Amino acid sequence: MRFAIVVTGPAYGTQQASSAFQFAQALIAEGHELSSVFFYREGVYNANQLTSPASDEFDLVRGWQQLNAQHGVALNICVAAALRRGVVDETEAGRLGLASSNLQPGFTLSGLGALAEASLTCDRVVQF
């Protein structure tokens, strides 16, 4: 089956993103296709490359990045939600006159169209 995941919780502070990541790993391990992960609302914090967990904690931001690199899973970040929460790529940082960007490599700023497309092309969409 082909899946898409929607993550609405931050990398740390709630269980949503961690559960979504574990679900994503289980899907791939069972031979399913994970087409994309769409990060919305506070979920956009999963793409902040400035996140620095304690040395004894799992680095969820880099975990998502590794999922993208190893399995080609698209990591789409809602651009409107990201800008409101201070998560920007180089293009948006330049456009807004910000000194730097903080979008973790492997993540892409995108609109709700990416979520709509995933909903149309996947067998299941699971929200965390």
Swiss-Prot record:
Broad EC category: transferase
One Pfam entry name: DsrE
Active site: C78
GO biological process, one term: tRNA wobble position uridine thiolation
One annotated Gene Ontology cellular component of this protein: sulfurtransferase complex
Gene Ontology terms for molecular function: sulfur carrier activity; sulfurtransferase activity
Entry annotated with the keyword tRNA processing: yes
Function: Part of a sulfur-relay system required for 2-thiolation of 5-methylaminomethyl-2-thiouridine (mnm(5)s(2)U) at tRNA wobble positions. Accepts sulfur from TusA and transfers it in turn to TusE.
Subunit structure: Heterohexamer, formed by a dimer of trimers. The hexameric TusBCD complex contains 2 copies each of TusB, TusC and TusD. The TusBCD complex interacts with TusE.
Family to which the UniProt record says this protein belongs: Belongs to the DsrE/TusD family.
Protein name: Sulfurtransferase TusD
Organism this protein belongs to: Escherichia coli O127:H6 (strain E2348/69 / EPEC)
Gene designation: tusD
